[in-house]
Amino acid sequence: MKIDVQLDGRPQKAAARARELAELGVDGLFTFEGPHDVFLPLVSAAGAVDVDLMTNVAIALPRSPMHLAHTAYDLQTLSRGRFRLGLGSQIRPHIEKRYGAEWSRPAARMREIVLAVKAIFDAWEGNSRLRFEGEFTTHTLMPPTFDPGPNPYGPPPICLGALGPVMTRTAAEVADGLLVMPFNSVRHYRERTLPAIEEGLDRAGRHAADLAIYPQVIVGTGRTPDELAAASRGVRSLLAFYGSTPAYRPVLDVEGWGDLQPELNALSKVGEYAAMAELIDDKMLTTLAVHGTPEECAAEIVERFGAYSDRVCCYFPGYPIRDGHIADLVAAVRELTP
């Protein structure tokens, strides 16, 4: 099993941190669309390390498929074939109020964006003329001046982030990979995610081998009591943030904790973030995340996801983690999955 970890998104830190993480033995690095651009750190990392790189995720709805295609194609070249384009839809308030973009039928739009980017790639690879005419976007013009030509490493795979059944089915129908959202549980994955994957593959006439599955897991790790307590606080805060979002309530519902979501949401609206974290008890912590020593976390990751995937994305949220603990976790996963 391969382990990907998050790259520091600050442009001035990305290359140096990429080298440090690569030396720890990680297999890949990913960025998320937070306080910094999601693509720029990977430009720096591509020239600094030889590990795999991925956006996890680039918010697709405010962007043109042509913009996404150009950036992904160039990152594929810079990374010498080690880039994956991870796309996500975000939720309505962010799309409308932060990005100032239109929100409607997110799964249908994401499906069309993935297909449009693939059509653009096919045109550049010389496989077909560009003629994509969809409901939301149209791309039918590609003069030679704007055509980069075939990529020496081939077009990058496109992964789609999903949690609910509709978006998960969409990913299984059209994407090369599924990024399983980190706010998840084993029960939700088995009862909700896997059936949606199978349904999407069946609809599209695809096979399991056509879709790479990348589970994402929230990790709280340390060795001393103080380190584990700090990790617990960081993880609880992130779980409370996710849990306050109505779109993520289905995960809580599966575990019988659905009534917690409106309580968390109400606290978030008045800025009571510390109180939100206090509502995440130990059972929730160990169900929705993994917590313990690096070796204990590695064993739990393999137990949860080893039967479904050979690659997992790990988050270490809101607490100072020692580089040695990352290296130990990666080494332990490799020992358990030779």
Q: What is the role of each PLM region?
A:
Residues 1-338:
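Active-site-adjacent structural elements that line small-molecule/cofactor binding pockets in enzymes
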